[in-house]
C-alpha cells in the first residue's frame, strides 16, 4: 500500500489573509515504510517572510526569491502524490494552504484520503502532548538534527512516528485472499472508529535498519 507523508512550511497561519507556502515535502511509504523516494521544494511566496516564520524555519525572503512559485511546482507535486493517501500531522492546516494555492491557479483541491497523525496520537494518548516533538520524545526518536522546522526533516520524523502509532511494522497487517489488506479503507479517514494497535515492544529488524539507512542517505543527497 502506497502512502505519502506530507508536510509544509508557511509564512503564517492563515492563507485567506495572504499567508503563503514556502516549502513542501513528501516522503513515499510502501506498507508504512519509507522507500527512499521523496519530493521536496522551496516555494517563492511572492511576498515578505515575517520574522517569526524565519525564526521557526530559518527561511528568508532573500533565499526564497530565487526559487519557483507554486504554479511552477504544482504539477510535479500532484504527479508525485497521485491519488495516494496522505499522512499529515494536523492535516487541516497543511490541506488548507495547499487547497487555497491550488484554487488560485484554477486547479481542483486535493481529494486524497487523509490520515491525521495528530488525531491518531490524541486518540491513543488522551490528555498527553501530541506535537511532533512530543511524540518523537515519547517514542525515543532522535531529534538532534531538527534545529529548525523544515518540511523534509519533519516528514522523516513523522514517518517514524506514524510507524510507532500504528504499532510497528506489519503488526496485525493481514492479507486477504485477494492480496489486499483486511484492515479496510475506513482507517484512512479522520472519522475512523477502529482501535489503534498497541505500541511495538520489539527492536528493529535488520531489514528495517537497512531501509532506514537508505532513506537517510537519500534525504542527504
Language-model segments: residues:
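Acidic, Mg2+-coordinating catalytic module of metal-dependent nucleases/exonucleases
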Residues: 85-88, 92, 97, 101-102, ...
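Glycine-rich, pocket-lining loop/helix-strand segments that form or immediately flank
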Residues: 130
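Conserved non-catalytic scaffold segment of RNase H-like nuclease domains
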Residues: 1-112, 122-126, 134-148
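Acidic, Ser/Thr-rich low-complexity intrinsically disordered segments
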Residues: 183-221
Amino acid at each position: 500500500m502506497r502512502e505519502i507523508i506530507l508536510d509544509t512550511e508557511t509564512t503564517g497561519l492563515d492563507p485567506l489573509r495572504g499567508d503563503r507556502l514556502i516549502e513542501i515535502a513528501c516522503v513515499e511509504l510502501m506498507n508504512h515504510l519509507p522507500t527512499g523516494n521523496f519530493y521536496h521544494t522551496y516555494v517563492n511566496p511572492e511576498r515578505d517572510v515575517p520574522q517569526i516564520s524565519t525564526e521557526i524555519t530559518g527561511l528568508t525572503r532573500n533565499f526564497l526569491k530565487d526559487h519557483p512559485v507554486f504554479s511552477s511546482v504544482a504539477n510535479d507535486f500532484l504527479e508525485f502524490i497521485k491519488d495516494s493517501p496522505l499522512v499529515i500531522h494536523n492535516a487541516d492546516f497543511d490541506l488548507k494552504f495547499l487547497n487555497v494555492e491550488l484554487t488560485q491557479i484554477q486547479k481542483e483541491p486535493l481529494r486524497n484520503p487523509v490520515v491525521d497523525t495528530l488525531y491518531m496520537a490524541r486518540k491513543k494518548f488522551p490528555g498527553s502532548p501530541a506535537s511532533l516533538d512530543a511524540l518523537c520524545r515519547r517514542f525515543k526518536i532522535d531529534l538532534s538534527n531538527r534545529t529548525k522546522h523544515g518540511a523534509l526533516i519533519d516528514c522523516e520524523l513523522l514517518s517514524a512516528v506514524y510507524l510507532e502509532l500504528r504499532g510497528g511494522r506489519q503488526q496485525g497487517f493481514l492479507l486477504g485472499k485477494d492480496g489486499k489488506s483486511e484492515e479496510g479503507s475506513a482507517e484512512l479517514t479522520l472519522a475512523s472508529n477502529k482501535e489503534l494497535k498497541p505500541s511495538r515492544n520489539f527492536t528493529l529488524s535488520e531489514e528495517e535498519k537497512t531501509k532506514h539507512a537508505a532513506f537517510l542517505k537519500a534525504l542527504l543527497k
